[in-house]
């Protein structure tokens, strides 16, 4: 009976420790994504910050930002399109703050980050003042260690 009890304890502790193990590479990628994404939104952001963020992405990355961008198709020039779009808004904020609330790692294929952010600035297209505070969930699909799909959801 002692041996069965001991075996049961060993099995439970093994399963418990395996359930708690999280892919350290994806954990690091999640933090790097958040840090570089936040850096691109800073008032003093430059192409250096933008390129550090883009370096995490596949060349054919898909970017879906609901409800504004509903297409999540991966295109051969996905990264180039993101570079163009993000360059247009680069430096538009006069204030930007973000706070990471939760990070979720799903096996080796996905990351979800939930965060709040507050931004203030001038919209570069219409020169109107903007200010907003939101809670966002970014869901990232991972392929060969890079981010292949970004989906942004607003709370």
Predicted segments with their positions:
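A solvent-exposed, acidic/Ser-Thr-rich amphipathic alpha-helical stretch
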Residues: 24, 54-107
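Bacterial N-terminal signal peptides
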Residues: 5-14
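Short, low-complexity N-terminal intrinsically disordered segments enriched in polar/charged residues
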Residues: 17-56
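A short hydrophobic beta-strand element
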Residues: 107-119
């Amino acid at each position: 009976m002692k041996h069965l009890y001991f075996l049961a304890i060993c099995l439970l502790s093994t399963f418990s420790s395996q359930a708690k193990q999280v892919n350290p590479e994806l954990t690091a990628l999640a933090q790097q994504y958040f840090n570089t994404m936040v850096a691109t939104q800073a008032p003093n952001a430059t192409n250096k910050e933008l390129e550090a963020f883009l370096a995490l992405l596949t060349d054919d990355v898909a970017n879906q930002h609901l409800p504004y961008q509903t297409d999540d198709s991966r295109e051969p020039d996905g990264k180039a399109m993101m570079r163009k779009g993000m360059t247009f808004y680069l430096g538009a904020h006069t204030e930007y703050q973000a706070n990471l609330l939760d990070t979720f790692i799903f096996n080796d294929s996905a990351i979800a980050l939930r965060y709040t952010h507050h931004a203030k600035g001038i919209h570069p297209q219409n020169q109107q003042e903007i200010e907003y505070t939101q809670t966002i969930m970014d869901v990232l699909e991972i392929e060969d260690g890079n981010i292949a799909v970004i989906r942004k959801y607003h709370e």
